[in-house]
């Protein structure tokens, strides 16, 4: 690994990389979710006091890599996160690219059902092939129905306005 790992600058030999990876061999989805929920239970009360809206970004890619589990890949994962710490400050970065890589994710449905805690939007289009590989695509040419997603997000914003919520803005980046 020439360029290092996230959060590190040093490179690794394959042997060193495998040794580091082995330290995570006993961490499965259940343990990783428990760790995430423990973190959120500590940080969300502080976020509430500070008026900060936390928003977790979905896994990218939304499937295990190198044997490491992923726990923010589906609507059920987001529901689990919301239920673990029930606070409007415990929210989601809605990334159409990360969620859109999985054909079983209903992006418009996720907005309709869980949109009240979307605090940031990351509009990306991805294109899947028959083997499950994917690549970035032009916004209107990928597998994401960008029109339907944007319509659902605008309807969510209108709901927020109608009930007098202060957080009507959902910042986004393309």
Q: Language-model segments: which ranges?
A:
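Histidine-acidic metal/acid-base catalytic patches
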Residues: 14-24, 37-49, 53, 63-174
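Residue-level "edge-of-site" marker
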Residues: 60
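Active-site-proximal, glycine-rich beta->alpha crossover segments in alpha/beta enzymes
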Residues: 1-37
